[in-house]
């Protein structure tokens, strides 16, 4: 003879004759187990989740409490993450701080961990060529005050001859070969 036993609620020890919720290897009336954060019970059929700490959570509170948070939007990350400079991001939120370009592959950052694309990183540290607006990464550059140039882009503003390794004069923020400077400013 086959007999079917009626489960007993772990909380109230009464028989469960209708909906039985199994959580943590135990049977419950849905209204006798609730989310550890908001207290919501699961009598409406919503999902009961077990957190890594062994407590019951509704899906929202489980994510809010345990899912990694995006450094940019502060929301829980479900699925793929981008981890960089000790921080976690939604892949689409790992962006250059200046231009918001999504960063994939190579990226650059400053000492405080702020992500920048190559151009804006070199701009931030002062290594963009004034002429071409591209990063100076070869290690060779000409510095005039706080302005930097690739050696091949450091030329007289009037005759366009290269000024690398030769004397030059400055008028305002422009550089001239000695000959053109004398012609223009006597």
Curated annotation (Swiss-Prot):
Ranges of residues in domain LIM zinc-binding: 7-67, 68-127, 128-186
CDD domains named among the record's database cross-references: LIM4_Paxillin_like
PANTHER family recorded: LEUPAXIN, PDZ AND LIM DOMAIN PROTEIN ZASP
Keywords: LIM domain, Metal-binding, Repeat, Zinc
Pfam families per the UniProt record, alphabetical: LIM
Listed InterPro entries: PDZ-LIM_domain, Znf_LIM
Protein name (database record): LIM domain-containing protein DDB_G0271356
Record-level Gene Ontology MF annotations: metal ion binding
Highest taxon listed in the record's lineage: Eukaryota
